[in-house]
Amino acid sequence: MFEVSTKDELKRALTHNEDDIYVVNEKLSQDILERSAKYRFIRYAMLVNGYEIIKIKTFGAVDIKFVKDRSNY
C-alpha cells in the first residue's frame, strides 16, 4: 500500500507501477474523482474521505477504481 497526498507523489506512484495507491488528501481525492469521471475512467466511485485507488492495466491503459472500504483488501 503506497500512500500519497500530493499530485507529484501520485505521479511517482503511478510511474513506479505501485499496485495499491491510497490517497490521504481529500482535495486530491476529489480532483481525481472529477477528472476520472470527466474522462470516464471510473468503474465505481463513492464520495468518501480518502480513496483507495486500484490500478488495473488493460491494453496499456490504466483504469482507476475507487472503493469505500479498505478493510476488504
Positions of the model-derived regions?
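Acidic, low-complexity, intrinsically disordered interaction modules
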Residues: 39-51, 56
